Amino acid sequence: MVARGRRLEPRTSKKRGTATGPSPVDRARNGSKQHLLVDATGIPLAWTVTGGNRNDVTQLVPLIERVPPVRGRPGRPRRRPERVTADRGYDSNALRDQLRERGIEPEIANRYLGHGSGLGRARWVVERTFAWLHHLKRLLVRYDRRHEIHEAFLAIGCCLVCFKRLQNSL
């Protein structure tokens, strides 16, 4: 702004209120992450909600332990998957070793290689399930202050996804 040949300096005011949190572009992320474990058709088997600043690697084994018994072939119901396909956030040699000890074949993208590893052909099932869940606006944007309430709504959303898949198969 120019007035009478002089440049006026804009007044600076305090831009942050008392309820303003840290910048969302910092590495210390606000918010939450939803972790899903789905079968080959996209039906959620286990889910959890963690803070946005937590590593994904720490959540895969507890997620696998939450899988309920799944009936399939004759015999005992399965309690663990044969194979786990995950994105780069779960890339860890220690995690791969833990999965192999449990008899699970890990297919985890390497974070240091470029895109195009071929895992996208299997990972789209998880992304489609997230898209189904995000039709529920309550899960797309987290309005709940308490972790338990948001996880309960995620559980309801997973139940609705299972119900719709069952309805479509009849």
Name each model feature, range by range.
Residues 97, 101-103, 118, 122-170:
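Basic, amphipathic alpha-helical segments enriched in Lys/Arg and hydrophobic/aromatic residues
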